[in-house]
Curated annotation (Swiss-Prot):
The name this protein goes by in its record: Urease subunit gamma
GO BP terms: urea catabolic process
Gene name per UniProt: ureA
Gene3D superfamilies the UniProt entry points to: Urease, gamma-like subunit
Assembly notes: Heterotrimer of UreA (gamma), UreB (beta) and UreC (alpha) subunits. Three heterotrimers associate to form the active enzyme.
Source organism of this protein record: Pseudomonas aeruginosa (strain ATCC 15692 / DSM 22644 / CIP 104116 / JCM 14847 / LMG 12228 / 1C / PRS 101 / PAO1)
Length: 100
């Protein structure tokens, strides 16, 4: 399998996001990289499903809350930016204050 660097990045984000989902399901609090991966992977999948940028910007704020992450993590993530592929091209999705 010959993947481009962009495809490798997406695969890495997805894998890290899947690991974060499993840890969250076991009741563990997520650390910084896990929280970013979970949200980023969900945004990429949402774009693949055909959601709009505006929908994803809102959706990104609903995925995690303070009780699901380690202390200090929400303050470390003021925003998350993901370059996602939509049916009409690649767009930058920015989620401000993703963990409320």
């Amino acid at each position: 399998m010959d993947l481009s660097p962009r495809e490798k990045d997406k695969l890495l984000i997805f894998t890290a996001g899947l690991l974060a989902e499993r840890r969250l399901a076991r009741g563990l609090k997520l650390n910084y990289p896990e929280a970013v991966a979970l949200i980023s992977a969900a945004l990429l999948e949402g774009a693949r499903d055909g959601r709009s940028v505006a929908e994803l910007m809102h959706y990104g704020t609903t995925l995690l809350n303070r009780e699901q992450v380690m202390e200090g993590v929400p303050e470390m993530i003021p925003d998350i930016q993901v370059e996602a592929t939509f049916p009409d091209g690649t767009k930058l999705v920015t989620v401000h204050q993703p963990i409320a």
